[in-house]
Amino acid sequence: MPKATYMYWQKRFDRVNPDKEIEEKILEIRKNNKDYGYRRIYGELRNLGYIINKKKVQRIIQKLGLQVTSFTRKSRKYNSYKGKIGKTAKNRIRRRFNTNIPHQKITTDTTEFKYYEVNERGKLVVKKLYLDPFMDMYNGEIISYSISESPSAKNIMDALEKAIKVTAKSPYRRTFHSDQGWAYQMKVYSKRLKEERIYQSMSRKANCLDNSVMENFFGILKQEIYYGTTYNSYRELKLAIEKYIKYYNEERIKEKLGWLSPKQYRIKHMTV
């Protein structure tokens, strides 16, 4: 080997890595947030006081082989619409999802998950779990939810009661939005909202864009803990969802919230 070539590579090997600290911090962030891409890692670094641009973060992530691998698995969307079984409400939200007032605009929906269990005959059977969350459009925080093994009016009403309680001190009249699912048409549901002077709002029939904020949450939830993972019991899946909702509310940062989590954003602006 020519001496010049040897000296060149020796200098390369002896060179101190100027990005060592950043790389270690990025590895730490990804360890705690396995689904963070370069944008959220950039936001987390910014929150920690590092001055770095997005392109450099992206370059380091590629160097370390930390690109997020996305899983997709098509599944039939749960449809809670059973026809007109009660009264429907007009669409008061009209896709105006943004608000700078906490607890003023709340939305809800139901989604289903599948898990697999071996029955008494030793046969693998598919079972379902249902999630009914209520979200504050102010910061995307899940303020209440219920989880059940079958669609249940009781579980939806339980989650509704908690959402009503959490938002009780709102200085403005509240609006609770949903699709036209059977549970939201129930007389007991609309009556409870009227008792609290809460406006009821519903999406137009078969128009998921009228509740896209909740559809987006369901997509993120399933992308990060469901697609590509097999759950073998109701309890295992339920615990995973509960853990994720806590993480989503308290730790998962969003660019639109200034790289804060929903809870961090709410607390910051409550103290301003």
Annotate each language-model stretch with its function.
Residues 187, 194, 220-272:
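C-terminal domain-tail junction helix/linker
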Residues 95-143, 150:
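An active-site-proximal beta-strand-loop segment
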Residues 127-128, 146-169:
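Active-site beta-loop-alpha junctions of metal-dependent nucleic acid enzymes
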Residues 3-101, 207, 261-269:
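Basic, flexible linker segments flanking DNA-binding modules
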Residues 1-5, 21, 155, 159, ...:
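Generic alpha-helical secondary structure signal
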Residues 70-74, 176-180, 194-213, 229-232:
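RNase H-like polynucleotidyl transferase catalytic core
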